[in-house]
Every structure is written in C-alpha cells, then in structure tokens.
Amino acid sequence: MEEELMSLIKVWVYAIISISYCYYTSTRIKSGVFRLLSVLPVCVLFLVLPLFVSSVHFSGSTAFFLSWLANFKLILFSFDQGPLFPVPSNLSRFVCFTCFPIKLQQNPKPQNQMPKWGFAVKLAFFGVLLHMYEYKQHMSPTVLLVLYSLHIYLEYEILLAPLKVLLSISLWCDLEPHFNEPYLSTSLQDFWGRRWNLMVPAILRPAVYLPVRQMAGRKMNSDQALFLGVFASFLVSGVVHELIFFYFTRESPTGEVTLFFVLHGVCTAAECAAKRTRLVRRWKVSQMVSRLLTVGFVVMTGGWLFFPHLARSGMIERLADEAFLFIGFVKHKFFYLCRNQSLKS
C-alpha cells in the first residue's frame, strides 16, 4: 500500500507541474489553435499517467480526473470555454479546477439536501455491501446486479462528496454537487443530465453537445440537430469509458460499454423528442412509476452491457478488496499513532 501511495504521489506531482506550465505559459497565448497546441503535450501526458499506478481506485480516479475531465477542460480552455474560463485568479485555483471534478456554483441555492447524517448512513450501508461480497456465490444474477449497481453509486458518492467539501472550504467558494440522488430520477434525461455524475454533462455539453448541435442545425431541423447532439455526447462518453475500463483492467476494449452509452443516447434523444409531442404531454405518469421505469432501465441495461466486462475481469471484487485493504491500512496507522502518543505521554 505504501509503495502504491508513493507512485500515486509521483503521478500527481507530474500533473501539478504540467498544469502549472499551462497556467504560466498557455494563458499568455491567444485563444485558438496555438493555445491548443501548447496544451496538447500535457493532454498526452495525462493519458499516460494512470498507467503508472496499479491500484484500481488510484488508476481509475486518476484516469477520471486527468485523462478525461482535465483533458477536456484544457481543450475547452484553449478556446476560452469551459470551467477554466475566465481563468482562475491564482495558480492553486487553476490547479484545483483543472485536476478535480469540481465546478463553481454560479447561483448558490438554499441547501435542500439530505441531512448531514445522510452521508453517514450511505457510508454504513456501503460497509454492509462490501461484506455481502463474501456471500457472492450464493446470490442470484439479479441480486448481484443490484449489488454492483449500488456499489458503483455509493463508492462514487463516498469518494467525491468529501473531496467537494474539502475543496469548497479550501477555495472559499460554493461548488456544484456531484450527484443529486439519482435513484429519484423520473426520466433518462433527468438521470443523465441532472442527477448522475453532474461534472460529466457539465463538460460534455460545451465540448460535444453544443458544437455538434450548432453544426447540425445548419443543415437539419432543430429536432434532428438535438438528436445528433445528444447521440454524439453519449458516443464520446462511451469511448472515454472504454478508455477508463482499459486503465482498470489493462485489457483490450470490448465495445460493450460504448454500446451501453450509445443505447442510452438513442433512448434519451427519443425521449426528448417524444416529450415534445402532444400525446406525451397529455399522458401523465406518476412519479413513482417513472422512477421505477427509469432506474430499472438503467440497472437492467447496465447488467447487459456495462457490468459484464468488469465482472469478467474481477474488477468489482478488486474494488471491494482494495476498500477493505484501505480500511485496514487506516486502522493500522491510527492505532500505531495512538500507541506512539501514549508512549510519549
């Protein structure tokens, strides 16, 4: 564990040095092709850095933070767009807004979130889920699918929520939440656009959706341009997920996760088009039914296309094993420090 932590520290030292170069050099170059050329070496480096750590958590988070989000942010920054425009006021802010999945909250709203103990409940529930892997061989495929889905969601939220709080305090600013109770989604558009991993649509919208829709709008009607913009966003998301799965498994991509996002892109675009018709506007469905249909569709298609590659490669079990290992590592260090403190006193 300690050797892997040292590798992670080295990776992030390289990342911070590279982003510092962008802050001091690329910001002085006029936006456009030349600024893009100045950040491209950093983007290439960010594609390589996750390969220097072997832990599933470390390689996955580094790939998500740097290879995906940071690269997209730097490309958008090259054209004075995205979260890095206007340029943050100092280096530390520039590094944080580039490296981490955070976005400044433009119009802070009154807090309407679950109580503070909600995070503790999710943390405790996640601990129960980890122990359920000991009985995996006795579970039906349906129960396993629910277990995998809850594991991915809770692990994401448990890792990202404290990071948001820490950075919000450090930077003295309000930051957008990463999740908005996705299990309450009433449609695919609601799930992907307003509730699940919100930093991703915040990046894909200016980077993919708007440019594609604008270009398509010159030769297509508005509905067709919208469909193409949504489809392109999901296609790009699928390709990037294939890359992240490669960092996870170090195996050749299978295309399954890309098909998962292509399917959801088509269904989300069709849903958006259907909502504009009179029939659907008049057809009222209860929120409970909408939530069951939406979450059920996401989970079932995930079991068909998203999870199989991870399950075959044993990555989900490795995530659980590493979580147990990390908890044990923290306990060991905690008791070691307490013992040393008692000996000194």
From Swiss-Prot:
Catalytic reaction(s) noted: a long chain fatty alcohol + a fatty acyl-CoA = a wax ester + CoA
Keywords of this protein's UniProt record, alphabetized? Answer: Acyltransferase, Lipid biosynthesis, Lipid metabolism, Membrane, Transferase, Transmembrane, Transmembrane helix
* Family per record: Belongs to the wax synthase family.
Question: Transmembrane: present as a keyword of the record?
Answer: yes
Q: Which InterPro entries match?
A: Wax_synthase, Wax_synthase_dom, Wax_synthase_Magnoliopsida
Sections of the chain in a coiled coil: none
Annotated transmembrane regions: 5-25, 36-56, 114-134, 143-163, 226-246, 254-274, 288-308
Q: What enzyme category does the UniProt record give?
A: transferase
Q: Which cysteines are joined by disulfide bonds?
A: none
Function as written in the Swiss-Prot or TrEMBL entry: Catalyzes the final step in the synthesis of long-chain linear esters (waxes).
Q: Which GO terms describe its molecular function?
A: long-chain-alcohol O-fatty-acyltransferase activity
Q: Quote the subcellular location field of this record.
A: Membrane
EC number annotated for this UniProt entry: 2.3.1.75
Q: Which GO terms describe its biological process?
A: lipid metabolic process
Give the protein name, as stated in the record. Probable long-chain-alcohol O-fatty-acyltransferase 4
Offer a single GO CC term for the protein. Answer: membrane
What topology does it adopt in the membrane? Multi-pass membrane protein
